[in-house]
């Protein structure tokens, strides 16, 4: 579906997201654009992000709002003008706080938006506790105010709307073809990253207390006692990165832990990995676990994650507390790369539900 800038046939869509960084929502939007869906996008903050240029290459016009914490009123005036001047008839909100999304709905309606789509991607607001309370207070109001309610999973629906009734569960789209791992691709990836003959562990995501890279590092410390040639890769950036780097140094693990920063194309790292860690305090329906399964990689994740994300049998759920570090260690050490046939089977299983072209087509039908 191509947007009609004159507003005649196909309505114009504006997608709102937190940033244009490397998060799951942003990757979802990019995957949909690359699959042929057409929309423009607006970030909640003025900062430019790592995926913004890639989105623009797909024909997506990008906008930025004044940071809400700096000027609350200007934040909403910016949004009003973007919607009004751009003549966007559909506004697609992607966030995790019912109160702030409701305020965006009021602004969008005032600016002329005809249809509001609210899309839940998480199971709580990772910010201050008072924001969580506000979100709970406004869940029913948000639910009643939206024209279409979407969620990446049942738990995400319950968090944002307080119900999963009349909420469309829309899986996160990924590029499954790009994530297919043959023996040749795995060998080339390990050679390129200088990882031949080593057991490779990977965690993908922003450095934030919610993601618990510190827990992964404590697990890896135990792994390293058994396998000195093991390697841990933290792909991502964020406020906690220096803290984790210092922690690795204090543990004497710095030579075995890599920090490549934000990686636009993770397929090389998934192809090289033996296991992916995700010990998060909470997530919605994490794209990382879908991508890892599509690449045929064993996954270790928190019990708090929606268990329905295990579509291939490759995901193991464990409690992520101090008493369970040994259990994580044993499970990680048992992780071995799958055969090429099994990786292909896993990829095809994920592609049945989560291929970007399929999700893009479904969303277009829902929006119109």
Regions found by a protein language model. Give the residues of each.
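Aromatic "clamp/platform" in nucleotide-sugar-dependent glycosyltransferases that forms part
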Residues: 262, 281
């Amino acid at each position: 579906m191509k947007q009609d800038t004159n507003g005649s046939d196909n309505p114009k869509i504006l997608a709102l997201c937190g940033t244009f960084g490397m998060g799951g929502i942003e990757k979802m939007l990019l995957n949909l654009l690359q699959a042929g869906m057409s929309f423009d996008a607006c970030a909640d903050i003025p900062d430019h992000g790592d995926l913004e240029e890639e989105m623009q290459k797909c024909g997506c016009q990008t906008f930025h709002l004044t940071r809400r914490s700096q000027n609350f009123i200007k934040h909403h005036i910016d949004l009003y003008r973007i919607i009004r001047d751009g003549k966007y008839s559909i506004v697609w909100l992607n966030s995790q706080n019912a109160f702030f999304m409701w305020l965006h709905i009021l602004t969008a309606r005032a600016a002329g938006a005809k249809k509001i789509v609210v899309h839940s991607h998480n199971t709580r607001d990772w910010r201050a506790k008072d924001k969580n309370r506000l979100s709970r207070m406004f869940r029913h109001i948000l639910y009643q105010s939206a024209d279409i309610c979407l969620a990446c999973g049942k738990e995400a629906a319950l968090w944002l709307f307080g119900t999963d009734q009349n909420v469309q569960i829309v899986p996160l789209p990924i590029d499954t073809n790009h994530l297919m791992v043959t023996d040749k691709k795995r060998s080339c990836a390990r050679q390129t990253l200088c990882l031949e003959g080593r057991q490779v562990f990977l965690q993908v995501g922003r450095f934030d207390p919610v993601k618990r890279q510190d827990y992964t590092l404590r697990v890896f410390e135990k792994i390293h006692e058994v396998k000195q040639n093991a390697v841990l890769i933290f792909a991502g950036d964020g406020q906690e990165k220096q803290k984790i780097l210092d922690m690795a140094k204090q543990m004497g693990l710095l030579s075995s832990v890599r920090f490549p920063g934000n990686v636009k194309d993770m397929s090389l790292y998934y192809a090289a990995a033996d296991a992916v860690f995700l010990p998060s305090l909470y997530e919605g329906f994490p794209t990382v676990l879908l991508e890892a399964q599509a690449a045929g990689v064993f996954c270790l994740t928190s019990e708090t994650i929606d268990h329905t994300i295990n579509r291939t049998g490759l995901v193991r759920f464990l409690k992520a507390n101090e008493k369970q570090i040994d259990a994580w260690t044993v499970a990680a050490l048992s992780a071995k790369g799958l055969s090429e046939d099994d990786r292909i089977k896993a990829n095809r299983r994920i592609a049945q539900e989560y291929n970007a072209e399929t999700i893009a087509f479904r969303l277009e039908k829902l929006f119109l």
